[in-house]
């Protein structure tokens, strides 16, 4: 049976193909997570986004906490969001979604050349876990080249990380690999508030010895995964020193808290696609808060 298209329909079909371009075999993804407290946005955003070495990732997702979210108009977002927008627009990016709550934000950008009308049919949900709205998460999901991407950020309390009581709230409602139509590429970034379960003196001793593996043996994320929170999610190998808790504007740990990796990046495919971590590092030049930001770079195969 032959399918005949009108001239108008044929033209629309061709224009649609041209708008999206031929699908590449792979796309690059950068994710950034930073609990910044209430400090002003930094001026050097290129390093924060992983653009300082001439890279042009196809997708950039930024999860932030702080930067003055507790304002009279939190929906307008912190100043850093505007700064991201100004920088990335000049480099050919389009903002797909910017979601701000009282305690966190998630902003996703994509190179404009990859976008078509289907990409803009994105979905965002906000999950609140406690009555004070301090714990919860955001998910933004969208489609590029018929592949579904989902980015999740969450802000957890100390109890959330190891409690089975919050498994439903986080794992079931925020994990888009468990939907009837699972996402192909999923990334979970943010301040997971994961701590190291040893005393500060012992942790500092292991840091001074650069014994990262030894310190990671006490990491709460391992326990959380044993309790099936973040079930099936993978983290790139951690080779950098703990990102919390620093004395602001120094490289010295504040030992009122055990040095820990609070901001994390996890990845997962709901359809068996390949996600390759390329690098995973803390950005030690950003010293103005108790936390160091974490930048992860990935390559996904379409």
UniProtKB/Swiss-Prot annotation:
Q: Entry's CDD domains?
A: INPP5c
Per the record, the GO terms for biological process are:
nitric oxide transport; phosphatidylinositol dephosphorylation; vasodilation
- Gene3D superfamilies the record matches: Endonuclease/exonuclease/phosphatase (3.60.10.10)
The leader peptide range reads 1-20
Found, by tissue, as follows: Expressed in salivary glands.
- Where does the source fall among the domains of life? Eukaryota
Question: In which compartments does the protein localize?
Answer: Secreted
Matches recorded under PANTHER family: INOSITOL 5-PHOSPHATASE
Please tell me what else the database record remarks about this protein.
Answer: Has some sequence similarity to inositol phosphatases, but no inositol trisphosphate phosphatase activity is detected.
* Protein task: Heme-based protein that delivers nitric oxide gas (NO) to the victim while feeding, resulting in vasodilation. In place of heme, the heme-binding cysteine can also reversibly bind NO when it is present in high concentrations.
Q: What is this protein called?
A: Nitrophorin Cim l NP
Q: Where does this protein come from, organism-wise? A: Cimex lectularius (Bed bug)
| Taxonomy of the source species | Eukaryota, Metazoa, Ecdysozoa, Arthropoda, Hexapoda
């Amino acid at each position: 049976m032959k399918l005949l298209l009108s001239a108008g329909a044929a033209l629309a079909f061709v224009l649609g193909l041209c708008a999206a371009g031929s699908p590449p075999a792979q796309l690059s993804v950068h994710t950034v997570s930073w609990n910044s407290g209430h400090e002003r946005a930094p001026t050097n955003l290129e390093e924060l986004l992983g653009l300082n070495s001439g890279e042009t990732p196809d997708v950039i997702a930024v999860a932030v906490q702080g930067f003055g979210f507790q304002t009279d108009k939190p929906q307008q977002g912190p100043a850093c969001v505007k700064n991201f927008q100004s920088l990335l627009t000049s480099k050919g990016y389009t903002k797909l979604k910017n979601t701000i709550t009282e305690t966190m934000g998630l902003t996703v950008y994509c190179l404009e050349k990859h976008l078509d009308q289907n990409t803009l049919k994105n979905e965002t949900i906000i999950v609140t876990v406690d009555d004070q709205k301090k714990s919860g998460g955001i998910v933004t999901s969208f489609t590029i080249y018929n592949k579904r991407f989902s980015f999740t950020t969450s802000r957890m309390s100390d109890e959330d990380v190891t409690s089975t009581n919050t498994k439903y709230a986080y794992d079931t409602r925020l994990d888009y690999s468990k939907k009837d139509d699972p996402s192909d590429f999923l990334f979970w970034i943010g301040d997971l508030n994961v701590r190291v379960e040893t005393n500060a003196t012992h942790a500092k001793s292991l840091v001074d010895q650069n014994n990262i593996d030894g310190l990671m043996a006490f990491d709460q994320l391992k326990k959380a995964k044993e309790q099936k929170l973040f079930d099936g999610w993978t983290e790139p190998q951690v080779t950098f020193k703990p990102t919390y808790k620093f004395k602001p504007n120094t490289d010295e740990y504040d030992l009122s808290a055990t040095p820990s990796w609070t901001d994390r990046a996890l990845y997962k495919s709901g359809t068996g696609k390949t996600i390759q971590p390329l690098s995973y590092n803390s950005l030690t030049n950003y010293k103005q808060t108790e936390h160091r930001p974490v930048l992860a770079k990935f390559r996904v195969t379409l």
